[in-house]
UniProtKB/Swiss-Prot annotation:
Name of this chain's protein: Cytosolic sulfotransferase 3
Name of encoding gene: sult1st3
Enzyme Commission (EC) number: 2.8.2.-
Organism of provenance: Danio rerio (Zebrafish)
Subcellular location per the Swiss-Prot or TrEMBL entry: Cytoplasm
Cystine pairs: none
Temperature profile: Active from 20 to 43 degrees Celsius.
Keyword Lipid metabolism attributed: yes
Amino acid sequence: MEISDFSSMKLNSRPELIDFEGISMIHYFTDNWEKVKNFQARPDDILIATYPKAGTTWVSYILDLLYFGNESPERQTSQPIYMRVPFLEACFEGIPFGTELADNLPTSPRLIKTHLPVQLVPKSFWEQNSKVVYVARNAKDNAVSYFHFDRMNMGQPEPGDWNTFLQKFMEGRNVFGPWYDHVNGYWKKKQTYSNILYMFYEDMVENTGREVERLCSFLGLSTSAAERERITKGVQFDAMKQNKMTNYSTIPVMDFKISPFMRKGKVGDWRNHFTVAQNEQFDEVYKQKMKNTTVKFRTEL
């Protein structure tokens, strides 16, 4: 399939939030629900799960390089990452749905991405004991990144100004529901399902090489130190931001004049957005929402 297939992606207007299975969603991720729900996972599938804007593309690219970087290097220059790692629940008019792309992947293992909260992940992934790589990012930076993403992506609801968006974020009125429930849901699942690797965006920024090693160890991959180093260099933020195959510049519904898909990739950028009052309110809400969990985040390095 050619890259140009995505240029026929059609959107008439920004979607409205809808309530779906108890969380906020948009129809682009629910219109194909029967097929998503009944998706047939395989034992060697690798599901990359994150809340939006938490490092999905980064981990997708690392995994793609680990598995296919050597055996089919042409993938890296001819196919954008969203074709190599299909977005399972996506169904936009004019392009193949995520389930169809995943079903037709020629590779093994199949790398598949989702933003679904844990309770909505197709049950065949658990039944087949597929491996799941979850990436979590601290709530403050995640909120900032999501705000800029919503501004530039016409496939997302209108975000309003920063303060409006932040209030919605704290209330969990974002596409894919509350951040708090998302990160906690997968953290809890990890206690009963051993095939989840729970990663933190902040750890990846701090030491990408170390986290690539953790991935290899979880996936049972034996890669040489030289190979891991080559991959670590290739997935640095600035390299990916310039790379047409990873920066989403080939998707017409994203307006890069407003904000690039890959903006800063830093830890602590929230300090440039939160006022003192917003920060105090956010901390208060955070304490309430996260009081029954052991998962801990770093908001700066």
